[in-house]
Amino acid sequence: YIDGDKGILLYRGYPIDQLAEKGDFLESCYLLLYGELPTQQEKNDFDRCIMQHTMVHEQFSRFFHGFRRDSHPMAVMVACLGAMSAFYHDSIDITDPHQRMIASVRLISKVPTLAAMAYKYSIGQAFVYPRNDLSYAANFLRMCFAVPCEEYKINPVLARAMDQIFILHADHEQNASTSTVRLAGSSGANPFACIAAGVACLWGPAHGGANEACLKMLQEIGSIKRIPEFIARAKDKNDPFRLMGFGHRVYKNYDPRAKIMQKTCHEVLKELNIQDDPLLDIAIELEKIALSDEYFIEKKLYPNVDFYSGITLKALGFPTE
């Protein structure tokens, strides 16, 4: 549920800030799937079910070799998700509620593995197998950044930040990618094909690609000295330049996800003690100026979730593309 005028986002009746601060991503998954929060035993069982299905078919490793190393990861993910229907024939009947739930569990558990494999392939590193004893977010970070020659140490602050990014993006009512999934599903297409269609929609710069577009804008600004120039351009109605990462089509007030992500972003930057990244310096200064500028305050152009998530993901080590 979304109330854009009041800046409210609820998952099954629960405020997003409560879920992000007190729970974890798999708890939000359970809530969205079953309509209510789990008991401790239900949570333990659900976590175990997800984490015991994180492996993907070994033939997937060969599947990746059909792509160029510089392929956009979203192109790879669309292909991989569609290909899941070729490996898991027992969960492709979209009319069967039991098969739909099995497909949901497989998608939640295996998509991080495939995403990490896509990243590793793009940089020429060995795939890292999942570990069932780690949390969902910690496991994903390890699969992305661990290397065979040394032990990967989980940083709890970074793992928590990744988990919150997952929670904040778990649901947003009838957005473009959700609409695409439902449209594909209305034809009777299998769940994996439907999700692949949704990911293809998410690729668009006006949707999931917004945080990438925000980082590219920061690269275009180039230095802190040029921020006033770009602020002036953003105010000029005759200039096609748009300040990415500010304002929201749905939220006429502050994006409730942005409040949470702002705190998380600053925690990550503090934890990593990042002081020599010009892009992050520009982002922090741009945030300060925009939050104190009367033009942005009057028009309620506050930094949105894409602004902070893009900066956070970059700080975590994910390349812009």
UniProtKB/Swiss-Prot annotation:
Signal peptide: none
Pfam families: Citrate_synt
InterPro entries: Citrate_synth-like_lrg_a-sub, Citrate_synth-like_sm_a-sub, Citrate_synthase, Citrate_synthase_AS, Citrate_synthase_bac-typ, Citrate_synthase_sf, Citrate_synthase_typ-I
Example of a GO MF term: citrate (Si)-synthase activity
Keywords from the UniProt entry: Transferase, Tricarboxylic acid cycle
Source taxon at top rank: Bacteria
Example GO BP: tricarboxylic acid cycle
Listed EC numbers: 2.3.3.16
GO (cellular component) term, any one: cytoplasm
Pathway: Carbohydrate metabolism; tricarboxylic acid cycle; isocitrate from oxaloacetate: step 1/2
Catalytic activity: oxaloacetate + acetyl-CoA + H2O = citrate + CoA + H(+)
Active site per database record: 248, 306
Family, per entry: Belongs to the citrate synthase family.
Additional detail: Citrate synthase is found in nearly all cells capable of oxidative metabolism.
The protein's name: Citrate synthase
